[in-house]
Amino acid sequence: MKLFVGLGNPGARYAGNRHNIGYMAVEAIASAHGFGPWRSRFQGVTSEGRLGAEQVLLLKPETFMNLSGQSVGEAMRFYKLSPADLTVFHDELDLAPGRLRLKQGGGHAGHNGLRSIHAHVGEAYGRVRLGIGHPGHKDAVASYVLNDFAKADQGWLEDLLRGIADGAEALARGDGARFQNAVALRMQPPKPEKPKGEAKPAAPEAPEAAPDTRSALQRLADRFR
């Protein structure tokens, strides 16, 4: 079994926050792949289903962000999972809005949800870093992540979530490159090819110059007029 965790804060008040993009990601996977209903378990809510050959449990911790590791640790102990079975979807200030990066292991970079997970299960798990951009000053970070996405963000956000759902099966089987390609196709769809075999219209030929019938003396005189 694989455990996909989306980080966020519970309740309608936080539903549209930038900090909740992890919740949004696993919700998109559940919806696109016909997962079962969400039910309360492991200090959060879970939904079960299959992605290709893999049985996958989706988890949204409801401990609030800073205690996410309690929920994740409980689920992993129940199913006897290792960090290699865990992938966490979370917001990333250090990536531009709409950018996505995969990471295996490493530090938490100050993210309180990851910090809590580190404390409960170690750091050797996978992450899907979902770019939300940075407000420009560290003092503005808290209010920035706890505010909703702007209307101008909705286009790329919807494309990103669709791409995550498209590539979820590849991610579950460990094919990170194919997962990222699925997201890229949603974010930057290929340009339509020009029809082959159509010849470009020929440029119109310049009209031939009329023959110069002036005498040499006339041409010389015209130069000084």
Swiss-Prot record:
Catalyzes what?
an N-acyl-L-alpha-aminoacyl-tRNA + H2O = an N-acyl-L-amino acid + a tRNA + H(+)
**Annotated stretches, region: Disordered:** 187-225
**Molecular-function GO term, any one:** peptidyl-tRNA hydrolase activity
The UniProt regions of compositional bias labelled Low complexity, in chain numbering, are 200-210
Listed Gene3D superfamilies: Peptidyl-tRNA hydrolase (3.40.50.1470)
Site annotation (Stabilizes the basic form of H active site to accept a proton): which residues? D91
Main location group: cytoplasm
Q: How does it assemble?
A: Monomer.
The protein's name in its UniProt record: Peptidyl-tRNA hydrolase
Instruction: Give the coiled coil ranges.
Output: none
Please give the function described in this protein's UniProt entry: Hydrolyzes ribosome-free peptidyl-tRNAs (with 1 or more amino acids incorporated), which drop off the ribosome during protein synthesis, or as a result of ribosome stalling. Catalyzes the release of premature peptidyl moieties from peptidyl-tRNA molecules trapped in stalled 50S ribosomal subunits, and thus maintains levels of free tRNAs and 50S ribosomes.
Q: Where is the signal peptide?
A: none
Q: What is its EC number?
A: 3.1.1.29
Compartment list:
Cytoplasm
What are the UniProt keywords, alphabetically?
A: Cytoplasm, Hydrolase, RNA-binding, tRNA-binding
Family membership, please give it: Belongs to the PTH family.
Query: Site described as Discriminates between blocked and unblocked aminoacyl-tRNA, positions?
Result: N9
Q: Which Pfam families match?
A: Pept_tRNA_hydro
Q: Which organism is it from?
A: Cereibacter sphaeroides (strain ATCC 17025 / ATH 2.4.3)
Q: Binding positions for tRNA?
A: Y14, F64, N66, N112
Q: What is the lineage of its organism?
A: Bacteria, Pseudomonadati, Pseudomonadota, Alphaproteobacteria, Rhodobacterales
